[in-house]
């Protein structure tokens, strides 16, 4: 059986001159009962109970343009960050079946939090949520709205997305 999201993924040629900028914001959360373990590619083994910190958000902006191959730069809080960039690269490679158009784009990814880094508030899920929403937004500019892979990457990001 074919995966529903893969069957809806944009698989065509990105048009010449395709470019733009998208941005999304996703709130962080604090888990009261945390999920234990993961299955598959970052899918939670069991549910968790958490509450949303609506004033503590991760914001991601992606500038994109047509390219011969995937190329990207990642900036966190205004500074290029190769360590975070390596995690983004792994995600893009692992999930290129969901986002095949990325192999035809050059991306500049900018991410920041509305709360201090290393303050004890987890930002990995909210950052991944904002990032995935940006990718889905780029895809929607190619084919129209999608409901894509909301549980991929961190497990809880599907509960966090808020349009800026």
Ranges and model annotations:
Residues 126-134:
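Short amphipathic alpha-helical face segments that pack within enzyme cores
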Residues 87, 127, 158-162:
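Short acidic-hydrophobic sequence patches enriched in Asp/Glu that either
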Residues 121-123:
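Active-site nucleophile and cofactor-binding loops and adjacent substrate-binding regions
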Residues 146, 150:
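Short Gly/Ser/Thr- and charged-rich N-terminal loops/segments
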Residues 1-119, 133-143:
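ATP-binding N-lobe of GHMP and related small-molecule kinases
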Residues 107-110, 144, 155-164:
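Beta-strand segments within the central parallel beta-sheet cores of soluble alpha/beta enzyme folds
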């Amino acid at each position: 059986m074919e995966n529903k999201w893969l069957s809806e993924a944009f698989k065509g040629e990105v048009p010449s001159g395709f470019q733009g900028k998208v941005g999304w914001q996703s709130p962080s959360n604090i888990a009261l009962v945390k999920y234990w373990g993961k299955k598959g590619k970052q899918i939670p083994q069991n549910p968790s109970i958490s509450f949303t910190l609506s004033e503590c958000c991760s914001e991601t902006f992606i500038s994109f343009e047509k390219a011969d191959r995937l190329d990207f730069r990642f900036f966190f809080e205004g500074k290029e960050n190769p360590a975070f960039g390596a995690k983004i690269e792994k995600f893009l490679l692992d999930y290129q079946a969901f986002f095949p158009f990325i192999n035809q784009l050059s991306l500049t990814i900018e991410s920041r939090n509305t709360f201090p880094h290393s303050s004890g508030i987890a930002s990995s899920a909210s950052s991944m949520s904002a990032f995935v929403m940006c990718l889905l937004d780029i895809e929607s500019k190619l084919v129209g709205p999608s409901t894509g892979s909301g549980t991929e990457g961190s497990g809880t990001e599907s509960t966090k997305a808020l349009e800026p």
